[in-house]
A protein has these predicted regions:
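Generic N-terminal amphipathic, Lys/Arg-enriched alpha-helix
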Residues: 2-18
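N-terminal glycine-rich anion-binding loops that anchor highly charged ligand groups
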Residues: 25
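Charged phosphate-binding loop/patch that engages nucleotide di/tri-phosphates or the phosphate backbone
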Residues: 171-175
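Non-catalytic terminal extensions that flank enzyme cores
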Residues: 1-5, 157, 165
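Divalent metal-dependent catalytic cores for phosphoryl transfer on phosphate-bearing substrates
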Residues: 12-16, 39-163
Length: 175
């Protein structure tokens, strides 16, 4: 069980390791994750921790990302080796456990899948996946579903919101 002081210590440590812009985004994801956890009945502490640490490995350059994956025996496919920035979620889940002391598998899994999602996502995974996309500091032109529509949908139908995000992501990748 995480208390407020422990969460504050993790925040301070994280703030030293990521850019101020990334930290602002991270705090937005943490608060959005907590709000969604309240709405859907998920564990608030797990939502806070997963939201806070979801991008804890994001600020590494490509070479360092690959080196760290090798160090922690994180498997990388061909696409990830060509585009190492895709590894930040896998490495972030590892960092959450190794560097930030996260013991809950559910939290590490939510971090692991916050970018790609996966079939059969747990409630916490779906919350962090969605919170990363809709947090208040995000400002992006989304197709076919506008960001504001996804934000509204996320608080009354989480499954529909995750589907909308996945559709937007596929549309973006196809363009």
């Amino acid at each position: 069980m995480l208390d407020n002081e422990q969460l504050e210590q993790i925040q301070k440590k994280l703030q030293k390791n990521i850019t101020s812009k990334r930290y602002c985004h991270t705090i937005g994801v943490m608060h959005t994750s907590i709000s969604m956890a309240m709405r859907y009945g998920a564990d608030l502490q797990q939502a806070a921790l997963a939201g806070l640490l979801h991008d804890c490995a994001k600020c590494l350059d490509d070479k360092e990302m690959l080196r760290q994956c090798d160090k922690y025996d994180i498997p990388c496919n061909k696409t990830e080796k060509k585009q190492p920035y895709l590894l930040h979620a896998k490495l972030g889940a590892c960092y959450a456990a190794q560097k930030y002391g996260v013991e809950e598998d559910a939290v590490c899994s939510a971090i692991r899948y916050h970018t790609t999602g996966r079939p059969g996502m747990s409630l916490l995974e779906a919350i962090v996946f969605t919170a990363d996309y809709i947090e208040p500091n995000r400002d992006m032109d989304c197709k076919p579903y506008p960001l504001e529509r996804i934000r509204r949908t996320a608080f009354f139908d989480l499954n529909q919101a995750t589907g909308m995000i996945l559709k937007n992501t596929l549309t973006y990748l196809e363009e």
